[in-house]
Amino acid sequence: MSADITETPAWQALSDHHAEIGDRHLTELFADDPARGTELALTVGDLYIDYSKHRVTRRTLDLLVDLARAAGLEERRDAMFAGEHINTSEDRAVLHTALRLPRDAKLVVDGQDVVADVHDVLDRMGDFTDRLRSGEWTGATGERITTVVNIGIGGSDLGPVMVYDALRHYADAGISARFVSNVDPADLVAKLDGLEPAKTLFIVASKTFSTLETLTNATAARRWLTDALGDAAVAKHSSRCPPTRSWSTKFGINTDNMFGFWDWVGGRYSVDSAIGLSVMAVIGKERFAEFLAGFHIVDEHFRTAPLHQNAPALLGLIGLWYSNFFGAQSRAVLPYSNDLSRFAAYLQQLTMESNGKSVRADGTPVSTDTGEIFWGEPGTNGQHAFYQLLHQGTRLVPADFIGFSQPTDDLPTADGTGSMHDLLMSNFFAQTQVLAFGKTADAIASEGTPADVVPHKVMPGNRPTTSILATKLTPSVVGQLIALYEHQVFTEGVIWGIDSFDQWGVELGKTQAKALLPVLTGDKSPAAQSDTSTDALVRRYRTERGRPA
């Protein structure tokens, strides 16, 4: 049994420290330490990360680093990068970082040259997408492919669609992408609307191909294709990531169009693997290489930087500080870039599937809360939806603001004298400032506000935020942002002592759904279910589908 982190002197020291400073206001913290606005910040690659507006002092950061060391964060980090089997429940290495190693790097895991394998797949992906983008690869009728449709779910969908949206400005070969994930037929029908089968290529993306949603959607897509072009067309209009040769051959996929990845890559960590084929098809292999290089910048920073200057480690520790000592349950992710509109949804899977665990890696129950609930929307949309709760609600919600100095698009403001991007970013800076420092009753009253209205306008402040600022949203920056959060997840998981790389919690629901499907569709009235609620729901559903209840 591993040591319980909450029983360590480092945890107790943080608990005592929280009792001392937990109620201190950010206004006071800045007054006591005016330099914190510039000194509690780090530059990592293209990311400027300001963590000064957090309810921490320099002493807090020292104690959090002590906690990380007590939990063995540095040793666990080194074990991950070395390819040790730190996913203990599945006895697997955890090597998503190997997907972005440069070609001349060396890493042998379980007797296999991992880097050579990774670049072999990348080279094959590059050759395939070059042919698509140049028009050398054509469909069954000889026409160019103009749309790739990615069929996947979870990590095989959330990553590719997020990155595609973020990098849409780098589409330069007349190829667009659509993404199908939900087994609700409305999703596939909507995504196929307006497409021409002769100009469409399907990418079936699934790590294990045991996922019912992906199998069902792929089969329906094949039928749409063959109804128009015949069975022989499938080989010219489909690809598979990773290969499952028996199924793929039956489906009709050409084995040259299958691209593998490995069991040491978790689905939610796989957008930089063959699962990103749809992204590469749209932006090209050179831009995809820049995307991978961005990941590697942050990987190397996390691997080598001292903990006091290690951005992912510090941000993960600060997240844990709020979760376990302030009782915060969620973190808002607020990108001031519409191109990152799917980033919060992507992070939901990355963080919540990784750290939503109630037992530690050794199988014993955890003794503290684990897993932050991630959510968010792009600014300024969120300002007119849920920022009211952030500013004046009773719940503490730390927030990450992400913004860019140079826009991907810009237009003049309504009066023609300014930039809409400047207007957007003025809101970014204003929101972090008001969340931190608020506005007092005295200041509001001094403006002539009626006394009975003053309490309603008080902005308490002391709401913590991280500000992440980059010059522009590029392929490299997207990779850097993803890796920044990947390693925060790892940091928190190590402190909590959990396995951040399995996801057993999703399996039972899949099994039960398979068992219930024939109950829903059978010709005869089904046997009673094990609970009266499900039994009543099933019978009502059957009745409304015209089947005997």
Curated annotation (Swiss-Prot):
Family assignment from sequence similarity: Belongs to the GPI family.
Write out the GO cellular component annotations.
cytosol
Specify where it is mainly localized.
cytoplasm
The family database entries (InterPro entries) matched by this protein are listed as: G6P_Isomerase, G6P_Isomerase_C, Phosphoglucose_isomerase_CS, SIS_dom_sf, SIS_PGI_1, SIS_PGI_2
**EC number(s) given by UniProt:** 5.3.1.9
Q: What class of enzyme is it?
A: isomerase
The active-site annotation reads E353, H384, K510
Question: Please, which domain of life does this record's source organism belong to?
Answer: Bacteria
Q: Which Pfam families match?
A: PGI
Q: Which keywords describe this protein according to UniProt?
A: Cytoplasm, Gluconeogenesis, Glycolysis, Isomerase
Its recorded reaction(s) are:
alpha-D-glucose 6-phosphate = beta-D-fructose 6-phosphate
Please name the CDD domains in this protein's record.
Answer: SIS_PGI_1 (cd05015), SIS_PGI_2 (cd05016)
Identification of the protein by name: Glucose-6-phosphate isomerase
Q: Where in the cell is it found?
A: Cytoplasm
GO terms under biological process: gluconeogenesis; glucose 6-phosphate metabolic process; glycolytic process
Gene Ontology molecular function terms on file: carbohydrate derivative binding; glucose-6-phosphate isomerase activity; monosaccharide binding
Query: What does the function comment of this entry state?
Result: Catalyzes the reversible isomerization of glucose-6-phosphate to fructose-6-phosphate.
Q: In which pathway does it act?
A: Carbohydrate biosynthesis; gluconeogenesis; Carbohydrate degradation; glycolysis; D-glyceraldehyde 3-phosphate and glycerone phosphate from D-glucose: step 2/4
